[in-house]
């Protein structure tokens, strides 16, 4: 999306408002089992690593048991509403409500009424595939006079990138490692910090 109107507007806002910075701190939440081998499919609602650490919340594996969690609140960094995650043999799904990210000093917040991601394994030997949805999403920069909120795409293409000074916001982030596809609804990185919201993972499964 480099060079698009969204990036040009945000770039201007950053120049006026000054550099951005993530707020430090630390947090631990309900996590995936330590040292466990990743199952073929899995999902979790939110995680972060850096000065602020949030272990995967509402993690679920291939057993198909849905996991839910109440609001996640890290003052000055991120808050969410309810979280629902599901993982079955051939698909995974994550949904996070009422997302508000306060990880910028001059950009007030990135928010969305809901962020979700899903991935599926092909039944015919093809690669896994997935998608993400962002409902009511926007980025707000109140320190720039008369600067309107920038709406986020509801169904962004894979790896849609928005640059915010030293930070990078990736919508529908999709990566493949050793045959495993990881789909992250919203991924923010920069300044030694990252934040993942609505993560689904699908990998190779034995069909025998």
Model-derived regions, located:
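Secretory targeting and sorting signals
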Residues: 1-36
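Extended, solvent-exposed, non-transmembrane regions
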Residues: 34-208
């Amino acid at each position: 999306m480099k060079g698009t109107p969204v990036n040009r507007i945000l770039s201007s806002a950053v120049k006026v408002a000054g550099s951005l910075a993530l707020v430090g701190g630390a947090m631990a939440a309900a996590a995936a089992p330590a040292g466990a081998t990743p199952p073929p499919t899995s999902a979790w609602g939110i995680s972060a690593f850096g000065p602020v650490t949030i272990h995967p919340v509402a993690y679920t594996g291939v057993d198909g048991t849905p996991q839910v969690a109440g609001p996640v609140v890290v003052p000055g960094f991120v808050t969410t509403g309810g979280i629902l995650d599901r993982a079955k043999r051939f698909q995974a799904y994550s949904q996070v409500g009422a997302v508000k990210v306060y990880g910028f000093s001059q950009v007030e917040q990135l928010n969305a009424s809901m962020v979700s991601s899903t991935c599926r394994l092909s039944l015919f030997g093809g690669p896994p595939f997935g998608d993400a949805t962002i409902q009511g999403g926007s980025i707000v920069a109140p320190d720039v006079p008369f600067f309107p909120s920038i709406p986020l795409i509801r169904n962004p293409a894979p790896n849609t990138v928005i640059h915010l000074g030293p930070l990078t916001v990736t919508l529908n982030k999709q990566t493949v490692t050793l045959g495993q596809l990881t789909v992250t609804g919203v991924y923010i990185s920069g300044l030694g910090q990252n934040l993942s919201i609505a993560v689904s993972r699908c990998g190779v499964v034995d069909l025998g």
